Amino acid sequence: DASDTATDVFTYTVSDGMTSDTATLTITITGVNDAPVAVNDTDAVNEDATVTQSSGSSLLMADDTDADDDDSFTVTQIAVTGGSNSAVSSGSSYNSSGTQVTGTYGTLTVGADGTYTYVADQSAADDLDVSDTATDSFTYTISDGDATDTATLIFTVTGVNDAPVADNETGAVNEDATLTVSDGTSDLLHGDTDADGSASLTISAIRTGAEGASGTAGSIGSGLTGTYGTLTVAADGTYTYVADQSAADDLDASDTATDVFTYTVSDG
């Protein structure tokens, strides 16, 4: 350890050709501080989740070493790989005065004691399809009080299924007519989205009434009677609405009324 000493003793003999004498050579070796050795770490998290390491073999310093047995070391700096270092407060833990840095896919909070938590940012990782992966890389620095070493902490972020987003649609028809929508520019799925680019959307349910209200459930591919007509919806979002003139007879010329249905879109 630093300032410890040890001796290496040698015996030598001198001679004048007739007689000889023996003496010793003692070399005192003084220890100096050995730098700690930081080891690269990895962890994994889903795009919509949080991973926390607060004890044991998963701490940042669990595999780090120092040849000086009596040395203890702490995390002193953290950075996004390739970015500027941020100081980690002495005596901190991830949930008490920890230092926070934001990476590509989430936010990492680190304590001087090697504890950390990583909160994935789902909006940043929305482009990941289910089971696709991406990495978020950070560097951390440890110190034994005199010397330092730096290693990486890499998170593998795995994509999960993102729910589709349905967009409200409108149509118009005269009271004695039929509206048929059979193209992809105005059907029910037009404007609906899914962050998982490979997802295939379908209509999975239909009912009368507005979203959040009660109504009568129908079946995909079968007619569902509303207030002023009958709606038939296919799974691919195409639909036909047949106005019921008898139900709309009270409407004067150019008067309008609405018939509202709620549909559910699914990505499977």
Where are the regions that the model predicts?
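Acidic/polar, solvent-exposed loop/turn segments
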Residues: 1-268
